[in-house]
Amino acid sequence: MSEKAKKPQKLKARLPRGFVDRSAADIHATNEMVDKIRRVYELYGFDPIETPLFEYTDALGKFLPDSDRPNEGVFSLQDDDDQWMSLRYDLTAPLARHVAENFNEIQLPYRTYRAGYVFRNEKPGPGRFRQFMQFDADTVGAAGVQADAEMCMMMADTMEALGIARGDYVIRVNNRKVLDGVMEAIGLGGEDNAGRRLNVLRAIDKLDKFGPEGVKLLLGPGRKDESGDFTKGAGLGDEQIEKVLFFVGIKDYAASADDLAKLVAGTSKGEEGVDELNTIGALVSGAGYDATRIKIDPSVVRGLEYYTGPVYEAELTFDVTNEKGEKVVFGSVGGGGRYDGLVSRFMGQPVPATGFSIGVSRLMTALKNLGKLGQVKPLAPVLITVMDGDVESMGRYQRFTQALRAEGIRAEMYQGNWKKFGNQLKYADRLGSPIAIIQGGDERAEGVVQIKDLIEGKRLSGEIEDNASWREARVAQVSVPEAELVAKVREILEHQAEDVRRAAEGR
């Protein structure tokens, strides 16, 4: 008895963990937001560039290319010349490589913006993805803090261009140099204490997560979490901890500025950092940005390990409900700062740089919560239905379609099984088509087309119960000569747009 041939096993369709498919609505909303951001950047004189998704792993900075497989945090592969390449994890490291490689050709200051996907080889979770979009702007080759002040002003203008009202956002500014001065003042200056300074930076980076008491433990002996795991602390004494917490706990910079200046007095970096903060404050104030929009705030601690001078963060201050049903402040949607060391890694000479990055997906969530994004959906295409399948008729339907497109009207000729006309109208309904164009043999003989207003037809069918009222209402289907097709379609679309405007205004 012959063995039955085994059926080939179907390949299971599955999305990789930490990645998402994006719908048309999501893409349209992203494009709408990115276009608004781009317009602000270009008003400031920034121009676009684009770098590849892949870079040599050593160019990304954080990761060692000589490990067996450099996949800690990045997705990597080995090229045919045995060199490791990795998907970019941000847009800044590729910019640094680009600037260094083209340094003799580019014009400094080099002001650019970039939007694109970045990749993180990390454990995915709720709201934590392995691929997401960032939108960056950077100035390379400008050492003065006026470049940092301009970045803060551009961030503020970007928030407002996106429809976020004053009072619903704030750009918060700190300076890494001031913290360096604080650490020097408490006895952690010099190369011998580099490791302890790094531990302090990592401890205060947890301020939002653990609060002052949690950070106090991490600055001191250490902290045990709820699971019982123990994180060794930086080993500072009580007086040292008090001074660090004073600095990161400042809420009113103007009221605490004198005390901060005294704390870092005699430390070159600390005094320089305070001067830079004061200068940024004066520059933005002189340009008309008050402290409700751009605020000097030493509690900004994210990225202090990475940045070399001013650090800034765009925070949305309105409340949202989290997954636990609790009211929380929405929080950060972007940030940046001065990173004078990144380009210099390739150059052997100092190259100042400053910039910021917007988390596109997170900001898009905020804008949807505010009703500022995705409210105006792109108009679905006019559907040209197919009544007859002969070549002559098909050519005529295609001509109608092209005539509409030539006048800037989205149009689509039905490509499914044309013999079931009811399915064509169902398709138009699912698509959200505003109008259907119909021409059978009788209409073709007369040189006319039927234009069906699908939106008006749907409204009438829901509101009118008897045939008499239907006939007296605005006509939902009209017959016009072929030559008047485009003009009549445009007229109906304008009526529909006016109805939408009236509805939005409550009229």
UniProtKB/Swiss-Prot annotation:
A GO CC annotation given for this chain: cytoplasm
EC assignment: 6.1.1.21
Biological process per Gene Ontology, one example term: histidyl-tRNA aminoacylation
Keywords assigned: Aminoacyl-tRNA synthetase, ATP-binding, Cytoplasm, Ligase, Nucleotide-binding, Protein biosynthesis
Pfam families (UniProt xref): HGTP_anticodon, tRNA-synt_His
UniProt-listed SUPFAM superfamilies: Class II aaRS ABD-related, Class II aaRS and biotin synthetases
Leading EC class: ligase
PROSITE patterns: AA_TRNA_LIGASE_II (PS50862)
Reaction(s) catalysed (UniProt annotation): tRNA(His) + L-histidine + ATP = L-histidyl-tRNA(His) + AMP + diphosphate + H(+)
Subcellular compartments: Cytoplasm
Domain of life: Bacteria
Gene Ontology terms for molecular function: ATP binding; histidine-tRNA ligase activity
Alphabetized PANTHER family for the sequence: HISTIDINE--TRNA LIGASE, HISTIDYL-TRNA SYNTHETASE
Record text on subunit structure and interactions: Homodimer.
Stated family: Belongs to the class-II aminoacyl-tRNA synthetase family.
Identification of the protein by name: Histidine--tRNA ligase
Organism from which the protein derives: Agrobacterium fabrum (strain C58 / ATCC 33970) (Agrobacterium tumefaciens (strain C58))
